[in-house]
């Protein structure tokens, strides 16, 4: 029964991830070309359909190296300009001081630092979605010895890319206040990236950088939909050997995804964030149980599992109704999160000792 619940939950997460990584590239491509955004939605969905239906080495495996290269070029180019601009005085990077360790959100009352920070910024820290992609990536490796550089290296690289872009956005718009003003004026992340790349990297560099920005979400979306197809097919024990069978599973998924594309991005992303962290929490407790049963030190998994339990329970208590929370006072959420974390720890230790 728990397995069925996790399958449904993972399918929901993958759908939300796929949807959230359609609008951004479509909007940016529409701005660059002047074509209607709906047309680009159809183009991106067409790619997703082929990537979802065909074997992973036919499309995804062939285009990923180029997309990854563009993404790394974009990050390194922007990072290099940050260093150059700060050295020459062209830009000013905000220094980390005691005063800067606070909530800079334009609406801090509705977006409290804890637990919102650990839900909105989730992929580079610990991610349930990325865990669902591990089997796909593992099948693409010729030898198990590549697992460490591939998975650990990807985690570190993603963290570096995220830090570069966070710094770039703050520096370009004149600090957190300017970044908030740009967001309040209706500038989406895709629009901001377009502005920064065109301003800092020149025309050629901007083209490659934009390619990386478009490729980054698309490479998450295609694998999300592919994993969702496999999960749904496995849940219903529906063979996927024939193309017709794959279409039977995929078509309803894409119909629902297309409808969801017209929802507010920030709302979808918060659902992605909390779903991501709940799945990561379950995975950490599972890994802790495995280590304990194997006679190994389990605290390396137990402590992060407790922290994420606190984060998830607190978020579900204090988040607004529209993003799945109960809109309770922050103190209630903090207490509930701590109690839940230690209660699960006590249950975990009790179960492990009985074994």
Briefly describe each language-model feature range.
Residues 1-55, 122-126, 212-221, 240-241:
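Helix-loop-helix module between adjacent transmembrane segments
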Residues 1, 22-41, 134-159, 190-195, ...:
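Helix-loop-helix connectors at the membrane interface of multi-pass transporters/channels
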Residues 61, 75-87, 91, 98-106, ...:
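A generic transmembrane alpha-helix motif of multi-pass inner-membrane proteins
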Residues 1-3, 19-41, 88-113, 177-191, ...:
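Inter-helical loop and helix-membrane interface segments of multi-pass membrane transporters/permeases
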Residues 82-96, 152-195:
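Extracellular/periplasmic helix-exit of transmembrane alpha-helices
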Residues 17-32, 45-67, 234-237, 260-268, ...:
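Membrane-water interface regions at transmembrane-helix termini and the short interhelical loops
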Residues 5, 38-43, 153-162, 170, ...:
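Loop-to-transmembrane helix boundary motifs in multi-pass membrane proteins
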Residues 3-5, 66-81, 155-164, 250-254, ...:
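Small-residue-rich segments of transmembrane alpha-helices in multi-pass membrane proteins
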């Amino acid at each position: 029964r728990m397995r069925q619940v996790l399958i449904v939950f993972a399918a929901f997460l993958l759908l939300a991830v796929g949807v959230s990584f359609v609008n951004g590239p479509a909007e940016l491509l529409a701005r660059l070309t002047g074509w209607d955004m709906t047309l680009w939605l159809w183009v991106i969905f067409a790619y997703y359909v082929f990537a979802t239906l065909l074997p992973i080495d036919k499309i995804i495996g062939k285009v990923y190296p180029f997309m990854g290269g563009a993404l790394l070029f974009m990050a390194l180019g922007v990072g290099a300009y940050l260093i150059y601009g700060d050295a020459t005085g062209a830009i000013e990077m905000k220094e980390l001081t005691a005063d800067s360790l606070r909530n800079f959100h334009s609406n801090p009352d509705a977006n409290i630092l804890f637990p919102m920070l650990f839900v909105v910024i989730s992929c580079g820290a610990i991610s349930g979605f990325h865990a669902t992609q591990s089997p796909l990536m593992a099948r693409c490796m010729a030898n198990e010895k590549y697992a460490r550089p591939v998975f650990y290296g990807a985690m570190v690289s993603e963290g570096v890319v995220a830090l570069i872009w966070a710094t770039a956005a703050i520096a370009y718009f004149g600090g957190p206040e300017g970044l908030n003003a740009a967001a309040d004026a209706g500038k989406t992340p895709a629009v901001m990236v377009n502005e920064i790349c065109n301003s800092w990297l020149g025309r050629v560099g901007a083209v490659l950088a934009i390619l990386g920005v478009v490729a980054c979400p698309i490479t998450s979306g295609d694998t999300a939909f592919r994993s969702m197809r496999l999960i749904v097919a496995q849940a219903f024990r529906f063979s996927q050997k024939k193309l017709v069978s794959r279409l039977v599973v995929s078509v309803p998924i894409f119909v629902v995804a297309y409808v969801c594309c017209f929802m507010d991005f920030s709302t979808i992303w918060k659902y992605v964030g909390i779903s991501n962290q709940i799945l990561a929490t379950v995975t950490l407790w599972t890994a802790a149980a495995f280590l304990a049963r194997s006679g190994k030190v389990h605290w390396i998994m137990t402590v992060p599992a407790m922290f994420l339990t606190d984060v998830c329970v607190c978020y579900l208590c204090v988040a607004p109704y529209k993003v799945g929370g109960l809109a309770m006072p922050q103190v209630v959420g903090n207490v509930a999160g701590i109690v839940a974390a230690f209660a699960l720890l006590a249950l975990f230790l009790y179960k492990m000792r009985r074994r």
